[in-house]
Amino acid sequence: MIYTPINAFALRRYKHILAVTKAFKYMLMLRGFKEERIDVIYNGIDFSQELQTYDMYTFFKNINVPHDLNKKYVGIAARLFAVKGVNVFLDMAKIIADKREDIDFIILGNGEMWQQCQDFIKGNKLENRVYMAGQVTDPVMMNSYYKYIDVNTLTSYSESFPYALLEGARCKCATVATAVGGIPEMIIDGESGCLVQSGDSKALAECVEMLCDKDDIRIRYGVNFYERAKENFSSQAMANTHKKIYEKIIKENVK
């Protein structure tokens, strides 16, 4: 109740506003901000450097997850808070685990829902199917995570333009995410990933199973996401957009 009025008051005193997504720009316009005052600059990450990773054996050993070459691995890297929809990920895992044994699940992250997640796993006898690896701070481990899982997921109820998806894209990891915030601007459904409605664990399970079963689609989505992100959401693309906007602002002020 305090945050919104204070920010609205501050934003109205600026001549130009930079929004991280078109969705956020539209939200500001609905609140009365003029469209010409708002420019969109997407988050970007570095695509120019070769990523360091551990070998597969070391990665799985470090997160205490048994590795089986005959299985697919589906992951989520998120803070364990309600807004991240980790409960939806767990519901999806149960749906799949109840009918097949060739897909396991990995959760990276800590948070207030840790015990709730543990209780769900134990209560549904998923201890050997869903693995909670905790918080990972080593960037090489995170690169390895996106390299060695088969499907990356994001189940949030609210997001802006999440780096977790861009990091997965950089490793050509196929992705299933909720269609919230700026995510539909990042992922083209059916081309560079799969989008589902927030809270829909059944749709999430269907997409995950499809990608695990169809290697050609999974690989194609990962490559397409990589190419799209490299072109539009790299740190260089972000810098170029900043430059163009600043040049436009300077030109306007010179008049």
Regions found by a protein language model. Name each.
Residues 51-67:
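A short helix/loop element that forms part of the nucleotide-sugar donor recognition site in Leloir-type
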Residues 72, 76-95, 112-118, 202:
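A conserved mid-protein helix/loop that constitutes part of the nucleotide-sugar donor-binding site
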Residues 135-136, 144-149:
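Short alpha-helical donor nucleotide-sugar binding micro-motif in glycosyltransferases
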Residues 157:
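Aromatic "clamp/platform" in nucleotide-sugar-dependent glycosyltransferases that forms part
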Residues 189-190, 194-201, 210-215:
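Conserved acidic donor-binding segment of nucleotide-sugar-dependent glycosyltransferases
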